[in-house]
Structure formats: structure tokens, C-alpha cells
Amino acid sequence: MSCKKGARQRLYVSLWLFYILVFAAATEMDFYSSECHSHTYEIVLNSFSSIWLLINLFLLLCSFAIFLKYWCYKTFASETVKGY
């Protein structure tokens, strides 16, 4: 019984989240109108999600740079030592 109850609760939560997402997206009716084009839609950079995206992008680029610095140094050092 508990498995069915847990599955039913997960289904209700999923349906609730779907309902919230659909009606939250439906409030932005100007986005779906025929006058709105992707190249004219205004990007908002002061929302939480855009700030979070920029922070994640910065961290990703920093980690990529650190990895490349380590990898290039490791390759350079092994190639240099190989000649001796």
C-alpha cells in the first residue's frame, strides 16, 4: 500500500508542478503573441535566474581555464623532461 501511496503523491506533485509551470508561462502572453520576435524580446539581467546563470558561467569559465593551465603545463613539462 505504501508504494502506491508514494507513487500517487509523486504523481500529484508532478501534476501540481506542471500546472504551476503552464499557468506561469501563460501569464507572459506577449511572449507568445505574433508581434513578439526572439530578436526583439527584451532580456532582463536583474532577475535571479539570469544572475545565477552568469555566476555559473563565470565559474565554468574559471574552472575550464584552470584545467587548461594545468593540462598545458603538464604536457609542457612531460615533453621537456622527455628530451633528457
UniProtKB/Swiss-Prot annotation:
Topology Virion surface: residue spans: 27-45
Signal sequence region: 1-26
Protein's membrane topology: Single-pass type I membrane protein
InterPro entries xref list: Herpes_glycoprotein_N_domain, HSV_GN
Keywords: Disulfide bond, Host Golgi apparatus, Host membrane, Membrane, Signal, Transmembrane, Transmembrane helix, Viral envelope protein, Virion
Residue ranges that the UniProt entry lists as topological domain Intravirion: 67-84
Segments traversing the membrane: 46-66
Listed GO CC annotations: host cell Golgi apparatus; host cell membrane; membrane; viral envelope; virion membrane
Keyword Cell membrane: no
General function of this protein: Envelope glycoprotein necessary for proper maturation of gM and modulation of its membrane fusion activity. Also plays a critical role in virion morphogenesis.
Quaternary structure and interacting proteins, as annotated: Interacts (via N-terminus) with gM (via N-terminus). The gM-gN heterodimer forms the gCII complex.
Family: Belongs to the herpesviridae glycoprotein N family.
Protein name (database record): Envelope glycoprotein N
Gene name tied to this protein: gN
